[in-house]
């Protein structure tokens, strides 16, 4: 049986290099947001946990297990939100895998430069899918912010946290609970979401225009 290339040591090493590169870019892009006391908690959750390079695998693996374990046991709209998170993670993971395959083809070994990253990014020829990914991130953010204002969600999460270890989903439930607590500190999410969308679209279009010479 052929070995799945995405599970090889070299592939996983390059994927971590890619995710570190992207995480560092995210931290540079949103340094001012992270430093703003108003957005301290949500900034820490987004840029240090949601987009951090470490522990991606447990989130990608546990999301599906979480969805299965929660069905019928938690506030329905919360399960819908988790479904959106699963979709976002699957898209992001698929994009990363495509990038890593191109990195291997380009001979990338121990690090990736901005020029290499931009060329590989554009070579995937998936402009519209990247736009969808950005908009889905915004949608997920707004959904979870709305849920953080509902008392029934707090009750559901506390109930699930109690049984999480039994279902083997403690880490991911803790992750989502941290997100809930972070969102709850923000009354109006518009500035955060609008800033994220604007900067991600600018980054996306800048890469495209730099490599292709065309503007969106």
Regions found by a protein language model. Name each.
Residues 19-22, 26, 47, 51, ...:
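Alpha-helical repeat scaffolds in large eukaryotic proteins
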Residues 1-61:
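Leu/Val/Ala/Ile-rich N-terminal alpha-helices, chiefly Sec-type signal peptides and the beginnings
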Residues 43-131, 140:
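Long amphipathic alpha-helical segments with strong coiled-coil/leucine-zipper propensity
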Residues 151-216:
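Alpha-helical oligomerization segments
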Residues 34, 54, 128-129, 143-152, ...:
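Short acidic, glycine/proline-enriched loop segments that cap or flank alpha-helices
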Residues 87-94, 132, 136-139, 159, ...:
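Charged, amphipathic alpha-helical oligomerization/scaffolding segments
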């Amino acid at each position: 049986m052929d070995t799945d290339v995405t599970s090889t040591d070299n592939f996983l090493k390059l994927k971590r290099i890619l995710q570190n590169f992207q995480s560092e870019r995210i931290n540079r892009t949103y340094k001012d947001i992270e430093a703003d006391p108003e957005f301290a908690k949500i900034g820490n959750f987004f840029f240090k946990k949601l987009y951090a390079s470490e522990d991606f695998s447990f989130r990608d693996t546990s999301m599906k297990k979480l969805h299965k374990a929660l069905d019928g046991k938690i506030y329905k709209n919360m399960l819908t939100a988790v479904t959106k998170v699963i979709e976002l993670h699957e898209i992001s993971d698929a994009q990363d895998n495509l990038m890593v395959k191109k990195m291997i083809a380009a001979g990338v070994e121990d690090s990736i430069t901005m020029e290499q990253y931009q060329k590989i990014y554009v070579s995937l020829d998936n402009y519209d899918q990247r736009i969808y990914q950005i908009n889905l991130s915004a949608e997920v953010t707004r959904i979870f912010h709305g849920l953080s204002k509902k008392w029934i969600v707090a009750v559901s999460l506390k109930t699930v946290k109690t049984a999480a270890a039994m279902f083997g989903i403690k880490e991911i439930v803790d992750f989502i609970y941290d997100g809930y607590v972070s969102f709850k500190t923000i009354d109006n999410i518009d500035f955060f979401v609008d800033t994220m969308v604007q900067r991600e679209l600018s980054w996306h279009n800048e890469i495209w225009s730099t490599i292709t010479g065309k503007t969106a």
